[in-house]
C-alpha cells in the first residue's frame, strides 16, 4: 500500500506542530525523539509504536520541516517575517491560513516521501521531498530576489581559461 490514511492524518498535524515549533527547531526535536527511542530500546521497551508514530511520521523532517518551511514562505507574504526565517515559530501570526498551509506542507511532504519509498527510488527520499516542497514554496510565495545579480558578474568577466578549468574539474 502506497499511502496510509493514519500517516496522512499524522502528517497534517505534524505540519501544524512544525509551524508552531519553528522549522530549524524541528530538527532538534527530531534528534531528541530519536535519542529517546534509542534509550528506550536499549532498556528493553518495545518502541514499535513510537517508531511508527513519532520517528516515521510526526517528527520525520520531510514532513515536519517541509511544513514549517512552506508555512514560513507563505507567512512571509502576509506577516512581518521573511520567507527564509525558518528558525522562528509562526505562532505569533495567529493566522489559521498559515496553519493550513503548514498542514498541507506536511501532507505533501509525506505523499512525496511515501511515493518515492513505494517505488524504491535509489535516492534520499526525505531530502528529495524537502527539495521539491522547498522549490514549490519558492515558486508560490517568493517575494525576494531569486538570485543576487552582483554574484553573477564573474559570468561576464571570466576568461576562457577559467571556463576550461571549470569544465575539467
List where the protein language model places each region:
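Early transmembrane hairpin of solute transport permeases
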Residues: 6-116
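Flexible hinge motifs at transmembrane-helix junctions and intramembrane kinks/re-entrant loops
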Residues: 24, 121-125, 143-144
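Interfacial/capping segments of alpha-helical transmembrane domains
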Residues: 28-32, 146-152
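Alpha-helical transmembrane segments
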Residues: 55-67, 121-136
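Membrane-water interface of transmembrane alpha-helices
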Residues: 69-82, 131-149
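Membrane-water interface at loop-to-transmembrane-helix junctions
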Residues: 93-98, 152-169
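A membrane-topology feature that recognizes alpha-helical transmembrane segments
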Residues: 106-112, 127-130, 134, 141
Amino acid at each position: 500500500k502506497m499511502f496510509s490514511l493514519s500517516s496522512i492524518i499524522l502528517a497534517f498535524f505534524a505540519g501544524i506542530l512544525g509551524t508552531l515549533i519553528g522549522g530549524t527547531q524541528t530538527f532538534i526535536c527530531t534528534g531528541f525523539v530519536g535519542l529517546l527511542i534509542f534509550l528506550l530500546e536499549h532498556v528493553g521497551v518495545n518502541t514499535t509504536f513510537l517508531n511508527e508514530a513519532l520517528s516515521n511520521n510526526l517528527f520525520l523532517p520531510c514532513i515536519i520541516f517541509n511544513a514549517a518551511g512552506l508555512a514560513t514562505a507563505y507567512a512571509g507574504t502576509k506577516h512581518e517575517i521573511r520567507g527564509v526565517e525558518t528558525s522562528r515559530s509562526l505562532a505569533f501570526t495567529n493566522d489559521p491560513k498559515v496553519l493550513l498551509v503548514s498542514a498541507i506542507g506536511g501532507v505533501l511532504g509525506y505523499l512525496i516521501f511515501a511515493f518515492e519509498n513505494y517505488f524504491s527510488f535509489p535516492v534520499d527520499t526525505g531530502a528529495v521531498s524537502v527539495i521539491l516542497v522547498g522549490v514549490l514554496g519558492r515558486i508560490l510565495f517568493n517575494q525576494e530576489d531569486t538570485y543576487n545579480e552582483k554574484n553573477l558578474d564573474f559570468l561576464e568577466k571570466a576568461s576562457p581559461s577559467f571556463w576550461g578549468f571549470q569544465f575539467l574539474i
